Structure formats: C-alpha cells, structure tokens
C-alpha cells in the first residue's frame, strides 16, 4: 500500500514539475495510433485552388462601359428577353378580358355581383403577374417592351349556355392558353441553359396556374349542373361571399 501511494504521489507531483516530461498516452488494446504526416489545413478539397483575382479578370473585361448597356445582365440571351416580353403581353391581354367580364356582370341589368367580384380579382391577379415579369426583366438586365392589347368583347351572353357558363368556359380556356404560353417560356429558358429563368417560372407561375385551372374547371362543372335559371343566382352568391362577406 505504501509503495502504491508513493508512486501515485510521485505521479501527481510530476504534473506540476516544470522539468517533468509530459505524460505519454497509451493506446487502447487493439488500436494503433499513428502520427499525421502533415497538416491538411491548407489542402484544396478538390485539388483546384480558387484564385479570385485571376479568375475575375475575364468577367471584368465584360463589364459594359457604355451607359445604355445593362450592368446586371449575365447569361441572359435575347431569346429569353423576347419570350419574357411576350409573356408580359399575354398576362395583360388576359387581364383586359377579365376586366371586361367584370364590367359586364356589374351592369344593373345583369347584376351578378359574385361573378363581377371574381373576374375583377382575376383581372388584378393577371396584371400582378405581368408586373412581376416586368420586375424580373429589369432584374436580369433586359428591357421591357410593352406591346398592344387587343380590345376584348363587351357582351358575354350566350343563347344556349347563358352568360355565366359562357364566361366561365372562356376563362377556363384563357387559363389553359396562359399555361401553354408559360410552358413555352420555360422551354426557352431550358433550351438556353437559363436555370434562373426556369426556376422563376416554376416557382412563381406554373404551380399557381394548375390551381387556377382546377378551380375554374369546378366552376364550369357546377354551372353546367345548375343551368341558366335560379341556380346561377345561388352560384353567384357563393362567389360573392367566398373568402369573407362582401361589402
């Protein structure tokens, strides 16, 4: 016991002795401890060292010096720029048609306020889509070029279907047409390797477009069930109070 205590005391004292050697770690049984041959702190993970001041030179040469040229533009081809401008025109045209439908159903001798509300909101939504595309065009360094808008119809009555069903079927066709145009825009982006434009179309438009087509398809089916009579009034009331009571 005395020998063990003395050995333990000597070991304890050696920890505080300035001349004592540091304790040697003893590897666990079955393990082999090897010292690292060299530090890996400065090794490149891929074997390629990034040299920003060298690699940025070619980009620096591409920075425009004329005031008319965009400074933000990068990997944004003319075809993509034109396709975005075309989609802006599509959104504005559809918005204009929906606005005409709003005006029709808001007439005193038509008086379907729910349908008027629905088409007014739809018109505003399409205009927002156009404005979002315009903002994106500027963000990528493109130039917004607004095109002419076709004058829409002012009357939407139909002898066989009635005005509500006729207008809703037209709206469904417009949403499907808009979806086709968006898919074309996405194809242009994909063809030119513009992953940012493709992501923008996917994130901001395509999913929402599918939802709109489904919603209006259900409205068409419901209007076909109720016919042109009293059921249209009940359908209109549903739209009027959808999302909260109307003023």
From Swiss-Prot:
Residues 1-40 form a transit peptide. Fe cation 2 binds at residues 126, 175, 209. Gene3D superfamilies: 1.20.1260.10. It is found in: Plastid, Chloroplast. Disulfide bonds: none annotated. This is Ferritin-4, chloroplastic. PROSITE patterns: FERRITIN_2, FERRITIN_LIKE. It comes from the Eukaryota.
């Amino acid at each position: 016991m005395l020998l063990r205590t003395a050995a333990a005391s000597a070991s304890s004292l050696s920890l505080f002795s300035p001349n004592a050697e540091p304790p040697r770690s003893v590897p666990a049984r079955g393990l082999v401890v090897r010292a690292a041959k060299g530090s890996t702190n400065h090794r490149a993970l891929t074997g390629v060292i990034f040299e920003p001041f060298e690699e940025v030179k070619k980009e620096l040469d591409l920075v425009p010096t004329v005031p008319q040229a965009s400074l933000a533009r990068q990997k944004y081809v003319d075809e993509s720029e034109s396709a975005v401008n075309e989609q802006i025109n599509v959104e504005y045209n559809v918005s204009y048609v929906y606005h005409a439908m709003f005006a029709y159903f808001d007439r005193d001798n038509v008086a379907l306020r729910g349908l008027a509300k629905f088409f007014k909101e739809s018109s505003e939504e399409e205009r927002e889509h156009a404005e979002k595309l315009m903002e994106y065009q500027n963000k990528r360094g493109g130039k917004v070029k607004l095109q002419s808008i076709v004058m829409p119809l002012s009357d939407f009555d139909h002898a066989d279907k009635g005005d509500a069903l006729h207008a809703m079927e037209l709206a469904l066709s417009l949403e499907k047409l808009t979806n086709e145009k968006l898919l074309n825009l996405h194809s242009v982006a994909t063809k030119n390797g513009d992953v940012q434009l493709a992501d923008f179309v996917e994130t901001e438009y395509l999913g929402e477009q599918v939802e709109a087509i489904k919603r209006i398809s259900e409205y068409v089916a419901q209007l076909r069930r109720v016919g042109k009579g009293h059921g249209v009034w009940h359908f209109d009331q549903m739209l009027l109070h959808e999302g909260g009571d109307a003023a």
